[in-house]
Amino acid sequence: MSENRNEGSSQAAKANSDTQTPSHFKVTHPRLRDQLKKKSSKKKGFKFVQEKMLKFQHVIRNQFLQQISQQMQCVPPGDQQCTQTSRKRKKMGYLLSQMVNFLWSNTVKKLKFKVPLPCLDSRCGIKVGHQTLSPWQTGQSRPSLGGFEAALASCTLSKRGAGIYESYHLSFQSYEAYQADKYHKDKNPSGYINLSTSENKLCLDLITARLTQSDMNLLDEAQLQYSDWKGQPFLREELASFLTHYCKAPTPLDPENVVVLNGCSSVFASLAMVLCDPGDALLIPTPCYNGFVFSSHLYSKIELIPVHLESQVPRSNLDSFQLTVDKLKLALTQAKKKAKKVKGLVLINPQNPLGDVYTQSSLQEYLVFAKTHKLHVIMDEIYMLSVFEPSVTFHSVLSIKDLPDPNMTHMIWGTSKDFGMSGIRFGVLYTHNKEVASAMKAFGYHHGVSGITQYKLCRLLQDKEWISKVYLPKNHSRLQKAYSYITKILKDLKIPFYNGGSGLFVWINLKAYLSPCTFDQEQILHQRFRDKKLLLSSGKSYMCIEPGWFRLVFAETHLHLQVAMDRFCHVLAEHKKHEK
């Protein structure tokens, strides 16, 4: 360990004598050093060091991401701009090494913290013991210090806590940057525009007006007290009526089969725990909603087994990304060969991120397959009222008169997407299985919805005339207009895209901009969009088997879309210029 420390220090010293430290760190580094000396003398211990270390790592990571992206844009290696970018990256690496060595030598060793000292290899990869971690790891949204960072976190967190910490930061780093620096036409014109998170911002005026009408303002004592953990009876009764109507159920749905929690992610994670044991698996067609990946690991500790769908199927009459029973059988067979215990099938309808809507016959085939293999079916229908293409018909699983296995079929819906109310945390499960409904009730203790929210939602869902005659027609019209605006630009740029006439997004093919077409290059392009303060979702995060796909959300105000697409076009134009 001492050899690594001396080598790192000598490299840092040499770098400082030959070059200047990047201007961003002229103040930051000395200040951190002085603070560390002062705090160390007061015996503040490891917690302070950890805090400063992680903060410093965050700054370093952002610099690495920007410079790696810039380096990839460079023309041949001998070019002056490319050389300067490479030098800046090395300076950053030396600075990180110097900081790590300082912390280790002055504080950490006194606490007998037995973790190998990280150092930097010649390519600025991080070495932890015998393991080398590239500054850009495939499939991750940021570089990671892997075992070293996990060891730092685990000094105060459990192993599970350290895993949650890492998983969260991998998943939400871009989102946190957006929350801290949002675009505003006047106040912050250079801020982030988020076309990554699927939110419907086209009808906020309609929803706000409806939620502030006088009938929404009742407040009684019952709303201020604990309620049935499944949800208030009046809300569950209204939800049963609402789903019967809009899902076209053949018979009235039972309020006792309704469970209300604070969001569809809570419903999915809780349902997975009820249906699966840790280590069990669920089949899911991919690309799929990436939130399921995060939720499945956070609580239930289950595995999602991808049923890969391809954009092009050679020598076949299948459509792009088409799910078939044969693909389900293949995925199930391969999982069993690996001794996986598959307990269910997750289907998203309308599909996210594709925007596809399953036909009634296809849906029936999937349900029969599940019954044959004794699998639960979890149907996520959160976009069921966001089908904006008139020629497309949505068929809810609750509309099927003779379900192959009602006891094993469970449907999830919420107001986040269809009503643009993602900030009002609400999700609903409808299941014909009384035992499942009873078990799910327990999760209301931790994931319940406030009484005031339940009352307002009940009043909103009761107003079917306003929903059917005012809200839905305007919402569909605005979605269609935004979709047309985005897809015209994509067509002009000759960018292929995919959407089945529903949802809040398009699935775009940027393979032509990746050379070579790899997930590494996909991540580089993803970072270049972020450098331009534009957030898109990369296909890798949706477990897509093919690199080059991105999800672009269009349910945004026209002004935001204009600025966002200007940035989008600029990034691609710059990329093309450097390719030449």
From Swiss-Prot:
GO biological process: biosynthetic process
A Pfam family of this chain: Aminotran_1_2
Entry keyword Cytoplasm: no
SUPFAM superfamilies attached to this UniProt entry: PLP-dependent transferases
Matching InterPro entries: Aminotransferase_I/II_large, Ethylene_sulfur-biosynth, PyrdxlP-dep_Trfase, PyrdxlP-dep_Trfase_major, PyrdxlP-dep_Trfase_small
Chain positions found as N6-(pyridoxal phosphate)lysine: K417
GO molecular function, one term: pyridoxal phosphate binding
CDD domains according to UniProt: AAT_like
Composition-biased stretches (Polar residues): 7-23
Keywords from the UniProt entry: Pyridoxal phosphate
Transmembrane portions of the chain: none
Region (Disordered): 1-43
Keyword Nucleotidyltransferase: no
Family membership: Belongs to the class-I pyridoxal-phosphate-dependent aminotransferase family.
Record PANTHER family: BIFUNCTIONAL ASPARTATE AMINOTRANSFERASE AND GLUTAMATE/ASPARTATE-PREPHENATE AMINOTRANSFERASE-RELATED, INACTIVE 1-AMINOCYCLOPROPANE-1-CARBOXYLATE SYNTHASE-LIKE PROTEIN 2-RELATED
Protein name: Probable inactive 1-aminocyclopropane-1-carboxylate synthase-like protein 2
The organism of origin for this protein: Mus musculus (Mouse)
Designated gene of the protein: Accsl
